[in-house]
Regions:
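Short acidic capping loops at alpha-helix termini that bridge into adjacent secondary structure
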Residues: 188, 219-223, 275-280
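An alpha-beta-alpha
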Residues: 175-217, 327-342
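N-terminal helix-turn-helix DNA-binding module of bacterial transcription factors
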Residues: 1-59
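Alpha-helical recognition/docking segments in bacterial nutrient-uptake
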Residues: 1, 58, 62-179, 242-248, ...
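Hydrophobic alpha-helical segments within soluble ligand-binding/sensing domains
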Residues: 164-191, 210, 233-241, 261, ...
Length: 349
């Protein structure tokens, strides 16, 4: 049987030999769509020099019905918010007959660009739950495995070309919460959240700021903590440090998530201040643990298990549609007004 050459593939596709050679080497100088077409044709023709990485990539896109292994990468996050997302991922993978490989990435591994050994095996897709450094993401992308991200860096453009991105709507929901505080007569409204960490927290701040500006209120930077914090304000001492820098106590504090809100409420209680009588507090995430804390927290319901399922659904779609443009998908949320923001202030005050 005649050996299939690069020239044979080029002739079949009416492409130049140089273009085909680059495509078979998975070169970024050739468009994604062209690489896929060339690799697929070469495989069908029996071209024997496809690299293992490229061959693996081809198999992912053409043996959709085989049992797939999906790798989930995440930091060992402090918040319980992530547990139910992983449960949703697991349930949806089971529904699709897929195997789950869950990998916790340590701070040291991320810093040293150490990837899980799982990625060296036959993996069909990756779900990334944490916002890793650009350098670490670049290492992952070298495996040419389809990726779906939950959330993104504050500068979302850093990863839009790498894979599909699922983002919980944050801007409008936080604007709605802040507007409600304003309508209740509050004007001195603070914010706590590390906007350098991820897009959703950045969007939450923009929603908060937008509500103030539309109401003719200038945001007071003295009661706004958006700086980089080592654990993104997931530790009480970081929240306490931020609050201790406030020159005065705001009428309300809008928090980027429920964990921050909990630490704020505990801090206020330690200072003899009451929520919402003295200070209104709001969160985001609607974590189950907050249902045991009084006063009940005004927050945003994400639907974590549903979100986990949605990540898998997007990855399954991507495996079947590899050459479609990458997508950024916003998932709807629900604002829940509760007792923690129910105070009203006379505008005359």
């Amino acid at each position: 049987m005649k050996k299939v050459t690069i020239q044979d593939v080029a002739r079949e596709l009416n492409l130049s030999r140089n273009t085909v050679a680059k495509a078979l080497n998975n070169s970024d100088t050739v468009s994604y769509e062209t690489r896929y077409i060339v690799i697929k044709k070469a495989y069908e023709m029996g071209y024997s020099k496809l690299s293992p990485v490229v061959l693996n990539q081809f198999k992912l896109r053409n043996k959709i019905d085989e049992t797939k292994t999906i790798v989930v990468l995440t930091r060992r996050e402090i918040s319980v918010f992530w547990n139910s997302i992983i449960m949703g991922i697991s349930d949806e993978l089971n529904t699709n007959g897929c195997k789950l490989q869950l990998n916790f990435i340590s701070e040291q591994d991320e810093k040293n660009l150490v990837l899980p050994l799982d990625l060296q095996e036959e993996v069909s897709g990756i779900i990334i739950l944490s916002v890793f450094t650009k350098e670490y993401i670049n290492q992952i992308m070298k495996y040419n495995i389809p990726v779906v991200f939950l959330d993104a860096p504050s500068n979302i453009q850093e990863i839009t070309s790498y894979g599909d991105i699922i983002i919980c709507e944050s801007m409008d929901s936080m604007k709605k919460i802040t507007t409600d505080l304003i309508n209740r007569g509050m004007r001195k409204i603070g914010f706590i959240g590390d906007t350098t960490y991820c897009r959703t927290i950045y969007d939450r701040y923009i929603g908060y700021e937008s509500a103030l500006l539309e109401a003719g209120i200038k945001p007071d930077k003295d009661i706004i903590a958006t700086y980089h914090a080592n654990t993104k304000f997931y530790k009480p001492e970081e929240v306490e440090a931020a609050l201790s820098l406030f020159p005065y106590m705001p009428e309300a504090i809008v928090c980027a998530n429920d964990d921050i809100a909990l630490y704020v409420m505990r801090y206020l209680n330690s200072k003899g201040l009451s929520v919402p009588k003295d200070v209104a507090v709001t969160g985001y995430d609607n974590v189950e643990e907050m249902s045991k804390v009084e006063p009940f927290l005004t927050t945003v319901r994400v639907g974590n298990q549903r979100l986990g399922r949605r990540l898998v659904q997007q990855l399954m779609w991507r495996l079947k549609n590899p050459i479609f443009p990458k997508e950024v998908i916003f998932v709807g949320v629900e604002v829940i007004f509760r007792e923690s923001s129910s105070k009203s202030v006379s505008v005359a005050e």
